[in-house]
Curated annotation (Swiss-Prot):
Belongs to the universal ribosomal protein uL23 family. GO terms for cellular component: ribonucleoprotein complex; ribosome. It comes from Enterococcus faecalis (strain ATCC 700802 / V583). One of the early assembly proteins it binds 23S rRNA. One of the proteins that surrounds the polypeptide exit tunnel on the outside of the ribosome. Forms the main docking site for trigger factor binding to the ribosome. Keywords: Ribonucleoprotein, Ribosomal protein, RNA-binding, rRNA-binding. This is Large ribosomal subunit protein uL23. InterPro entries: Nucleotide-bd_a/b_plait_sf, Ribosomal_uL23-like, Ribosomal_uL23/eL15/eS24_sf, Ribosomal_uL23_CS.
Amino acid sequence: MELLDVIKRPVITEKSMLAMDEKKYTFEVDTRANKTLVKQAVESAFDVKVANVNILNVRPKFKRMGKYAGYTKKRRKAIVTLTEDSKEIQLFEAAE
């Protein structure tokens, strides 16, 4: 698996935005990725030092649309904590 394929997208929620003040960034990652791969991918993509990686699996939810029923996709989230001397990740860059 390539390092660029590990990180899918940042998770943008109120809780994840508040965690950014403590240098904790939440990403949706590939379901096959482990902590070591996530750490290498974040360090190479954003040029930062990673202190800790926590991973959690999000189970699929049952959804119904009229008579059709199914499940959402299972996901995997990674909460990446940066070191104190590391620079911040700019997820939202202002276009000038």
